[in-house]
Amino acid sequence: MVLAAGLGKRMRPITDTMPKPLVRISGKTLLDWGLDSLAEAGVERAVVNVHYLPDQIVEHVASRHAPRIEISDERDGLLDSAGGIVRALPKLGAAPFYIVNADTFWIDEGEPNLTRLALAWDGGRMDILLMLADLKQATGHSGSTDFLVASDGTLRRAKGAPEGLIYAGAAIVQPRLFAAAAEAPHSLNRYFDEAIASGRLHGMRMSGSWITVGTPDAIAPAEAAVKRALAEAQ
């Protein structure tokens, strides 16, 4: 599931005429950075939700085959991160699935991070497994840290603690978490907190470089980070 329905208000004026997932970084759209990472991890089918200027995204992904794209339409109203997943559940099936934000991406170092995430997944112990980055790996992140990792891999809220990690915009989730949820606007944070309470929110520290692009001013640093990361990978 690729979350691509947001308004991208902070990216104006660029997003006055295009949805944020189609903003290009180093010649590739933010959406394609995420979809290419999914393809590299062996994902054959991805659901992309749309709301703002949706026809541009629909047209952009129409010719993709790796992964094949199904559209979850939110033209009638934004549903936030979790509400969008609830609407898309019939397309996502009964098995655990990836969630990827369309406005962040990363440059892998070694084994692809989404492959590592799948290998780390243990449905017997986990309801949600988050990919995490530390502040040193991040470009464009203006906030604080999100989670602290215990020795057993479980997470709790970091509340900005300097030793905390950032949620890197990719996760694996159990679809049954959303079985009783309403198709109404609500955030994934509700499910993160419920999983923390039950000891079933886990995290995996990513390798490589993590890049988030929130405003037009963030584009140049993002492209510099891509160039640097790709040079280091050679």
Protein language model features and the residues they cover:
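N-terminal nucleotide-binding beta1-loop-alpha1 segment
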Residues: M1-D16, A39-A41
